[in-house]
Amino acid sequence: MPTLLIIRPSNRPQQDIQTCHAAGWQAQVLSPIEIEADRSALKKLPEQFKQADVVFWVSPTAIETAAPHLNFSDGPRAHITVGQTSQHTLAQFSPYPVFSPEDGNDSEAVLRMPIWKNLPPNARVLIIRGHGGRDFLADKLTELGFQIDIAEIYFRRPHAIDWQHFKTEDIAAAYITSGEIAREFFHQIPPQFSRFFESLLYFTHHPRIADALRIVGAKHVKTVTSLSAALSSIPQRSQAVNPVEDN
């Protein structure tokens, strides 16, 4: 049975592992970055939450870190997420409808959503994210006249991968979910595995991450809509381990 490497923080891969098993794949997790909650920011978050007219959640990690600290009955009823996975995650905490874009899974797609036209002028938008997140949406919403409040409630910390017992046998591809993770992962690769990881097939869900992978040295990168789509695009193991052309 082929193995897919899931390269992401260890708090996130459970659903990915289930997806792999359902598709007939083994899954192995490597975490070059881990998530650390910002306790000080979380203490301030409930008051920011109460004052907001709408909340934008940037990721499932932002939701899982922040939501347990909030009373949703005290906050706004308008909630926006960057994608379907975040939407489903937030639905476990919020009794209110959750909106996400239908034509993408990034800040650009969120900005195109019609909900912004239905909000009152000068509405206060709370963006809940990790430290060092993109400012694209905040900047664009400010230009549109919204008041922006940003809660950076977690850190992404480099985490040393244990390579002592790592084996390349049966590893057919990898799935990676951020450019920052791609850069840290390739930074940690030992010399004896460098050629293997340069030639491995990588899947990701966004062209920006695909570009980051190519910059750090990945030769074979494919952009897909989801992990399920990635797995279904390789019906046979031989297709995963042989060189392929980039999209």
Please name every model-derived segment.
Residues 1-247:
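Signature of uroporphyrinogen-III synthase
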